[in-house]
């Protein structure tokens, strides 16, 4: 599905959750504890909106339902700034820990909440921690039944928490859902994440820039970049957790804003739906 554009339009996405929601801290912080933490998501999203406005860039914000319920003005602020609202589920639970019935309830509640707040349809979904895997592909059928048109939950890499390395690396149809995976680069018969979250924080920016150029110019495909508001917040409270979890979460927070700004300067970005409409195929929202 190549793009019909001279200079590639890439997708920029933000997973709107707070620092205490992450899977890395799930053994230390239960959902019942969330309300006891000082939220920082409003401040961090406001910073992101300022950066995007300065660079005249639109993005898709995959908003957690729990966040939307507590901060409805924040969701409206994002939408009023011209950005697309996507759904990140309600309770940030891995899909493999949910029954199909529980998953349906979670996404239905979150999607309806978001649509009520912005008075627009919500077509895009991303699972917490990219947790649509080979074992949970049934979730795509539920997403279609619940009204979603685009999914960005299948990460074609090997990882201890997620991943489906055999999946297509670029936008493709899975039944009637358009799957738009996070960007990877393929080397030595393996796919490697390069353009989002911890990959973006940990890798030198030059590698990320080279990888996106390879995807755009050599493979002639759009990139999918993602990050979280807490990744631009080096002053966030520290949570006691095992070293591996702390390394994944806290490393290079102080350099993330600069990397995001460099990406916006070096590449063209739009929302997920904007990029999908540029694909040389029928518009997925009307497919």
Which residue stretches match the model-derived regions?
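C-terminal domain-boundary segment and adjacent tail
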Residues: 2, 203-287
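Active-site beta->alpha N-cap acidic-glycine motif
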Residues: 2-81
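Active-site-adjacent pocket scaffolds in enzyme catalytic domains
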Residues: 3-4, 116, 120-123, 127-226
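Distinct, well-ordered alpha-helical segments
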Residues: 25, 71-78, 136-141, 165-166, ...
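The substrate-binding groove and active-site-proximal loops of carbohydrate-active enzymes
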Residues: 31-39, 62-64, 91-103, 128-131, ...
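Generic structural signal for well-ordered alpha-helices
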Residues: 45-49, 72-76, 104-111, 140, ...
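Metal-dependent polysaccharide deacetylase catalytic core of the NodB/CE4 family, i.e.
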Residues: 55-136, 148, 153-156, 181-184
């Amino acid at each position: 599905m190549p793009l019909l554009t001279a200079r590639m339009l890439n997708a920029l996405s933000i997973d709107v959750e707070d620092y205490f929601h992450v899977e890395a801290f799930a053994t230390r912080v239960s959902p019942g504890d969330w309300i006891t933490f000082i939220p920082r998501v409003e401040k961090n999203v406001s910073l992101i909106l300022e950066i995007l406005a300065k660079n005249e860039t639109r993005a898709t914000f995959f908003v957690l339902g729990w966040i939307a319920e507590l901060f409805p003005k924040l969701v409206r602020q994002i939408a009023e700034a011209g950005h697309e609202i996507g759904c990140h589920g309600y309770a940030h639970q891995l899909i493999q820990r949910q029954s199909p019935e529980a998953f349906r309830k979670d996404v239905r509640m979150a999607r309806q909440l978001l649509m009520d707040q912005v008075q627009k349809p919500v077509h895009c979904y991303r699972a917490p921690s990219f947790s649509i895997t080979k074992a949970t592909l049934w979730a795509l059928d539920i997403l279609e039944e619940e009204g979603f048109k685009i999914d960005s939950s299948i990460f074609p890499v090997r990882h201890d928490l997620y991943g489906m390395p055999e999946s297509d690396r670029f936008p493709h149809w899975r039944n009637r859902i358009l799957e738009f995976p996070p960007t990877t680069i393929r080397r030595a018969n393996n796919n490697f994440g390069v353009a989002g979250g911890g990959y973006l924080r940990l890798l030198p920016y030059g590698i990320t820039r080279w990888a996106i150029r390879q995807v755009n110019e050599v493979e002639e495909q759009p990139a999918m970049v993602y990050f979280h508001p807490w990744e631009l917040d080096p002053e966030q409270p520290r949570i006691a957790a095992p070293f591996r979890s702390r390394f994944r979460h806290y490393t290079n927070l102080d350099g993330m804003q600069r990397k995001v700004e460099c990406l916006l300067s070096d590449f063209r970005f739009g929302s997920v739906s904007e990029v999908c409409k540029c694909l040389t195929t029928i518009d997925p929202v009307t497919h």
